[in-house]
């Protein structure tokens, strides 16, 4: 019996993330992108007191990660403010403390996912509001399709995460996906670059906002399974996630060049 060939999925051709000649160059690049992500999170209103953290794995010491110092507002963070934390939760570079919750969650995600360079978590308004629904996002828009079959739900809220055992459970719930909804808490995204992890957090929060608004207005019509899977590969792949962040980088560096200090 003859079979019908499945047409190849059309994916936009985009530039690729840079490749570095030295570890020092790669480390600086990751730290610069990390500082820019904090400034953008502040710009988008993702700050909530001292809550929230974005981490970037060190390119040399891969069980260490760079993170924001505890108690510093996202809008004030510069490259020189970032701290380096080892696998024991000790600050080995920098003179500020680490958020224990950041270590409990992110250290276990980085350990479980050696493919992941960065992880982003914040108590963004729409992300935490949607998390209280105890549901996955539906494929209501093209942008939301980035997460179709690519996010999960961690439905075990027990207060602030201080124990690495709970971090292990969060990492297990995420699996090989790019994001997890922490019920009654917020969103967590990961990526092979800081750019990718930050972009997918930004667009996931907006997708939460979009679905909340759509359901408040009426009964939204979801995208079909077949079309959502195609769109997921088109807008949800790592290279596109990295590329989507580049205009945001250009804007924030021009507006707030001190972040590179």
Q: What are the residue ranges of the model-derived segments?
A:
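A conserved C-terminal secondary-structure "cap"
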Residues: 2-37, 178-261
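N-terminal low-complexity or amphipathic/hydrophobic leaders
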Residues: 14-88, 247
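Flexible, glycine/proline-enriched loop segments at strand-loop-helix junctions
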Residues: 24-28, 92-100, 153-161
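Solvent-exposed alpha-helices and their adjacent loops that cap or buttress functional pockets
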Residues: 46-48, 57-60, 74-77, 110-113, ...
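Short glycine-aspartate micro-motif
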Residues: 66, 117-121, 181
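Short HxH-centered metal-ligating active-site micro-motif
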Residues: 86-127, 164-172, 176
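Class I SAM-dependent methyltransferase SAM-binding "motif I" and its flanking Rossmann-like core
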Residues: 125-166
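A contiguous binding-surface segment within folded domains or other stable secondary-structure elements
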Residues: 152-189
